[in-house]
Amino acid sequence: MGEVEFEGVPERWTALLPSYADMAFALGGGQTLGIQNHARFGTEVYDELPGIEFDEDEVTELTEGGVDTELFYEMDADAHFIDPHILTHWYDWDRDDVDQVRTDVGPFFGNFIRRHSDEWHDYRYYDLYEALELMAEVFQARDRYDALVDLHETMLGTIDERLPPDDQRPTAMLVYPAESGNEFYPFRFDDGGISTKQWRDLGLTDALATTDVGHYRYGDRSTVDLETLLEIDPEVLLVRNHGGDSESEFREAVVEPLRDDPAASKVQAVKDDAVYSAGYLDQGPIINFYHTERAATDIYPDAFDDATLFDRERVAEIVTGEF
């Protein structure tokens, strides 16, 4: 998208995906005006940060209005932290729509970095902290960015100290339930997108690495069925789309149906009760802290059961600027 100019630090802004909403919130930018879908935004993690409040009722769910251009005029944001290619590929905007909103309302600033598998994305990708650094420039929040980097590096250091040797790490398969209920969209850890960051950081062996099963992407929603799942036979199964579920809700919705299925019940992960919620698709730095800690305790309970991988109070201080 080239250079983007801002008249000042945005006071009113919107994201579409929770990754950018979480980045801006972490940098002291406040709440997003809108979000793609409330159910996919893990705002419950903010409840664990002392003194931090997030009012979901003040956030417009953009998909309810079909992500129509009129919503952007109503929000009247100073900045839109959205990759405009998402609007043209997912929501039938054309370039004139993008240009009109940019001119009439405010600039677009974003890059779709959830995954790296879409053919239309033929420009540079950023990892989570590269994108966060650019967002910190927008909000003039270098001090907050540096503090988040320190926390992140401390977490990774703790992980490295506690991880079991490579040959003691399980093979894992990451999936998203398809509409049929008996099929899944596959996701590969080596895709490089920020949505799979925690699995790479935790050194998991991708069960798909030795197969020809591809990574989910726009325009190719190939699935794996339960028989294929049994053939791959992962030791750990990570299931998305249940980020906000309680443990009992997840077991009722996912684990029990797998146990009751003749094919799925033979999968090693199902037999070993190693089927876990994979959290949300999108994550900024705060959500990633929680995702990583939960994944570590789920997958490596002996190594991480007593571990607190990040300081909640420190995160709250960074958000408020009181550090």
PLM region descriptions:
Residues 1-6:
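Short, low-complexity disordered leader/linker segments with a strong preference
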Residues 12-93, 99-100, 210, 247:
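A short, structured surface patch at a secondary-structure boundary
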Residues 14-15, 33-35, 79-83, 108-110, ...:
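Structural recognition of the beta-strand scaffold that forms the well-ordered cores
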Residues 18-22, 38-41, 85-90, 114-118, ...:
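Solvent-exposed loop/turn segments at secondary-structure junctions
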Residues 28, 101-105, 202-203, 271:
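Short, structured coil segments at secondary-structure junctions
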Residues 54-59, 215-224, 228, 241-309, ...:
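Acidic/histidine-enriched, beta-strand-rich ligand/metal-binding domains
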Residues 97-182, 274-323:
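Extracytoplasmic substrate-binding proteins
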Residues 185-220:
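Alpha-helical, coiled-coil/dimerization segments enriched in small aliphatic residues
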